């Protein structure tokens, strides 16, 4: 059961991390992940690319400085240099330093998210959670993915009630049906594994009523199971 939870707990973070690593190669990202992410992928890609829009970074020199620091860290990450990308030292601010020094900028917020993903990959789930919590965006799908990743951190810390709370926030935050379906199913699976049958029934019933087009029948067995609890 623990292996299953660990695998499921990595799903959201891996989607979010893959999005980040490919943001400067958006065409390849879309081609690679269109089937996996479904109708949500276009909104997510556009949302992240929006962080690097002209209007956000050329007016304020601090924004420009933050962006340069972020892109340097991003380059290190794409080259497989995770420790350099994470940074945190004066000579190499990396994502952590950029998040700390430019927390009010869009690049600073995105750096907090990126640092959180690296900490997650290192198994530092509480640090990852705290960093992800600093990320904010006007894009509702990105906010949903943030809460989903925070939920994954809680799963790996065996704080399952907190994980369910984060998945619920992810469901509520998103204005994209596929993303809402994804986290509804994720919450249902977690509730089922915890034997919280009434809670699981709520989520799977929501899938049956709202998201059958995205589910493809994959949740039918779980829906039938919880109907009799």
Would you name each region that the model predicts?
Residues 2-43:
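N-terminal positive-inside, membrane-proximal cytosolic segments immediately preceding the first
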Residues 98-108, 122, 136-144, 171-180, ...:
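Short solvent-exposed coil/turn linkers within tandem alpha-helical repeat scaffolds
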